[in-house]
């Protein structure tokens, strides 16, 4: 018989940090990643929370993530540049890149920072909200592996390519918008898989485009 265990967000964050450190991540990267995942779960975005831990641990074990990346920023203009992530942990890499973007925007009034050589970066909302909390308007976009089927198609071709936006509000929490360009984010399917639940008919297609045969198939 399964036993339901209830954890506080702080406890969950600490457990994830310990697991990431045990997998080989340095303290700083593990702490930032665990914080990111815990906030995702705390805000109801379970598709990008603790459910991702096994995937990350597997990627680390297979050498798919650089444990101690040599991060660098290449400035291409007064308020633009490329942040090189050296294939480090996505949440850690992108958080460092956002720090630079915020600094440049405060200096110049506007900024653009591209990030290359990184891994799965979690929720885009996490980064744009940081900028909004610094009284800045932010837009973040990210490509992904091809998972989306074009209209009328039967094969994956486009990425989910998430887009996020945030803006500050006086005396209130920032406005934050975060979406995938597909019917649902891939993480929602992972979440359903972890819970052994079927997915709605219109979330995915098979090679025949049969909606009736899709239910739960990808889970």
What are these regions (language model features)?
Residues 21-24, 39-46:
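N-terminal and secondary-structure boundary signal
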Residues 27-38:
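Short, well-structured alpha-helical segments
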Residues 82-170:
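A generic, well-ordered mixed alpha/beta core segment in the N-terminal half of proteins
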Residues 212-219:
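Conserved small/polar residues in nucleotide/adenosyl-binding loops
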Residues 1-23:
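Generic N-terminal amphipathic, Lys/Arg-enriched alpha-helix
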Residues 148-211:
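Phosphate/diphosphate-binding glycine-rich loops and adjacent basic-rich segments that engage nucleotide
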Residues 48-102:
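Active-site cofactor/substrate anionic-group-binding motifs, chiefly glycine-
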């Amino acid at each position: 018989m399964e036993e339901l265990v209830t954890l506080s967000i702080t406890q969950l964050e600490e457990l994830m940090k310990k697991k990431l450190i045990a997998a080989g991540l340095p303290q700083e990267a593990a702490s930032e990643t665990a914080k990111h995942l815990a906030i995702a779960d705390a805000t109801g975005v379970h598709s990008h929370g603790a459910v991702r831990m096994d995937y990350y641990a597997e990627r680390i074990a297979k050498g798919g993530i650089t444990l101690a990346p040599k991060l660098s920023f290449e400035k291409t203009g007064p308020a633009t540049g490329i942040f090189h992530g050296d294939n480090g942990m996505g949440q850690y890499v992108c958080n460092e890149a956002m720090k630079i973007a915020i600094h440049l925007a405060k200096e110049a009034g506007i900024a653009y920072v591209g990030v290359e050589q990184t891994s799965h970066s979690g929720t885009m909302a996490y980064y744009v909200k940081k900028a909004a909390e610094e009284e800045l308007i932010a837009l973040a976009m990210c490509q992904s592996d091809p998972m989306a089927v074009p209209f009328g198609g039967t094969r994956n071709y486009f990425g989910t390519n998430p887009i996020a936006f945030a803006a500050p509000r006086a005396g209130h929490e920032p406005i934050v918008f975060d979406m995938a360009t597909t019917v649902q984010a891939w993480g929602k399917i992972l979440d359903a898989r972890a819970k052994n639940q079927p997915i709605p008919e219109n979330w995915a297609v098979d090679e025949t485009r049969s909606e009736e045969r899709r239910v739960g198939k990808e889970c």
